[in-house]
Structures are given as structure tokens and as C-alpha cells.
Amino acid sequence: MADYQLIVIGAGPGGYEAALRAAKLGKKVAVVERREAGGTCLNRGCIPTKTLLHASAIYRDAKNGAHCGIHTEDIHADMAEIFAYKRAVSQKLSAGIETLFKTAKIDLLRGTALITGSGCVRVADADGSANDYTCDDILIATGSVPSRPPIPGLELAMTSDELLEGCDHLYRSIVIIGGGVIGIEFATFYADLGCAVTVIEGMDRLLPNMDKELGQNLALILKKQGVKVFTNAMVQRVEQAGEDLAVHFTCKETEETVSGEAVLCAIGRRAYCDGLFADGVGVEMNGRSIAVNANFETSLPHVYAIGDVSSKIQLAHVATAQGIACVERLCGVQDHTDLSVVPSCIYCRPEIAVVGLTEAEAKEMGIPVKVGKHVMFGNAKTVIADPGRCFMKLVAHAETHELVGAQLMCEHASDMIGGVAQALANHLTAEQFCRAMRPHPSFEEAMTAALEDLCERLG
């Protein structure tokens, strides 16, 4: 008889949620984790960055409160205390996951996992001792790690993992290589605190994988906040330059140099499955990711993979949804989440949140669409908060009127995109989504204005 019915490798948002769901469905479950419960998201990613952004927003608003009668003197940011706050939040949430495991009678096996065969996992402790476990099924949820491309001198730059370890002082200046989600959130954090920030992006705009207007609008807002932005810029090398680091890059066929006390490499992440399989044991790969079918099965029988290690979309909530769907299918339970509808958020100011197709993507796919838009100059809550130019765009099929996408750039966009995702998952038309009364004053009432514009265009 096997030791467990399911062994989950990795206690991140995909792994721990899958384990909890499997235990609730009656499985005997173990989770292998060599670091803190919660994985990258909780300890080196989503939650730490949001904690830092919460702290920097308090500083920014206090420092800039004179326009509404709030006057402060001698305000300063203590970086050691900010990072201590970040650690305390992560530790509290990590401890909460371990408590959930105990309540659900899930065994947390501390150590590094090695898959020695179908249904066989060896767990090595830090001291080198190892124990072998058998199981009916294995779920790989090992996540991803920061990428560092082969650019000369890039080893001098930090990754997000290293930056989040903390620093006891505020950098005078920082150069961020990469204008995607990770780079933009760190740019926001350091700009809020008064650090001189430069962002270098290789594509023609920030957030190149999103709607064009989002990246263009973000660049304008960041520049107003004092951030230098270079696009169509390819980094050639990084060098030590006295106390600073010099980043050399080409922009419009001209070589440029910008220096900073620190450099962050935020070019992306890669699937992490290093050393996961014993010699002679392996699975089919899709590039550097583990290949899976629609049911998350790998080429090795009874071995499954979810989240960043196998998914094209590297988001914590995607890993969670995939993990839950995987174990529900294993247990013969009908899964209910539409995995094709994926909201995505960027926690800059104003926030950005998207779901579904952009107008350009729909047209490339041959889908006839109409777009409704509302610029929030007259939205009362936006005028009060004054985060910069905000807008909402909604995309619908021109013939069926079914909503197919949305792009929000406004305060609390991350808290509103879930409602739009619900509309997409349930195939609501623009007219159906417009029926709901939205509260006033609120940021969300701009959704009604965007929907009314969309309905007029649909006819």
C-alpha cells in the first residue's frame, strides 16, 4: 500500500491549494517543500511586492498631501523597517498555510524532492539524509525562478529574488531592465520613495504583451513621476563604474549609457524543474517547461504538472485554478472554473487590470469587434484620488454582442476585473452586463459609462 494517495511537490499557490482541495475530497496527501510554505508568490513575489507598494503608497500620499490639507514634516522612509514589515506579512501568511495543512491532516515534508519513478519520490533533508515515499499520483508545482539572459556583466544586476531580500538604505538610483509587470511594480515602489528610476524595455512600448494604449499611458504617467523610460532599447552590457553600475544599451541605433547605484534584471521568469528527476527518469519537455495535456498529465504515468513549471501564463491564480482542477479530475469531481478566462493585474498607480482579448488580438483572430471606452476625467473618485489619466475599455463581438475582453487603467482596477472575468466566463452580452446598477460615488460606475458607449456602438 502506498504511503500517500497524492504527493504534491511545491507549496506555492498552485501546490498548497491543490493539496487542500485533494484532502477535502478524501485523499491522503503530503506536500514536499524545501523553503517556506507559500512558495515564490507569498515569499519572493506577489505578496512581498504588494507589501512594499502599500508602504511606499503611504509615504507618497503623506508627502504629497498638502493639496488636500495634510501637512507633514521630516517624513522619511526607513528601508530596514519597510523590509521587516514585508517579512512579517509573509511569515504570518506562511504560518497560516502550515496551520491549514495541520487542520486538513496534510503532511508537510521538509526537503528537496527527487522523482525516482512513477509514484516514487525521494525527499532529501538539508543535512543530506533522505527518505523514500510511494504514492498513487504526483503533482509537480515547483513554479519558476527569475531569468538572467547571457548579457555581459548582467551578473552584477539583482534579480527580484535578491532585491526582495532587502537593503538597509534607499538606493540613490536604480536601473530596471525590463518594462513588464515585475519591472513596472518595482519602478513604482522606488519612484514613490524618491529614488531616481530608469526603465529600459526592449520592445516598442512598456507592457508589450498588453493593449497598446495601456503601455503608452503608463509611460506618460511614469515620466510625470520622474521615471526615465527607454523603449526599443537593447542592453549590451553592464559594468562597474565607481560606486555605481553602468548599463550600456542601444536605442534607435545609438549607444546610450545610464548609471545607477543598483540594477534590477526583470526580463522574465523560467520554469523551475532543475534536479527534479532522477537519472533515467524524465518527462517530455516543451522548451524549458514541462509538457502536459489538457488534463495536466505529463508523459510519465500518474505524474501531473501545473502552474509556472508547465503553463504559458505564469500567474499565481492560474496555478491555483489549475491545481484545483487537476485534483478534482483525479477525484472524479466535475471542475467548474473556466481556465481560458484569465485576469491579470499590475499594481502600479493607477492600477492596470485586463482580461480576455484586446481589440488588436481579436482582429488578428478574425473576430469582428466593437470597443466601448470611458476616460475617467469626470469620475468623482478619480478626481479625488488624482492618480493620472484613467480609463476603461470593453471589447465585444460585433455580431453576438458577447463581451470578449476588457482593459482597465484606474484606481482599484484589480478589485474590479474579477467581475468582468465573471461576465466573460458566463458569456454575457454587453447589454446584460450593463443591467446592473453600480454605486455612486465609485470607480466602478465608470464601467457603466464604458458599457453604454459600447452598447451604442454595437447598435
Stretch-by-stretch model annotation:
Residues I7-I9, A113, D132-G143, I176-I177, ...:
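Short hydrophobic core segments
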Residues M1-G12, L170-G180:
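Beta1/beta-strand and adjacent pyrophosphate-binding region of the FAD-binding site
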Residues K252, V292-A294, H397-A398:
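Short, acidic, Ser/Thr-enriched surface-loop or helix-capping motifs
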Residues I7-G14, A18-R35, T40, I47, ...:
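Flexible, glycine-rich terminal cap/loop adjacent to redox cofactors
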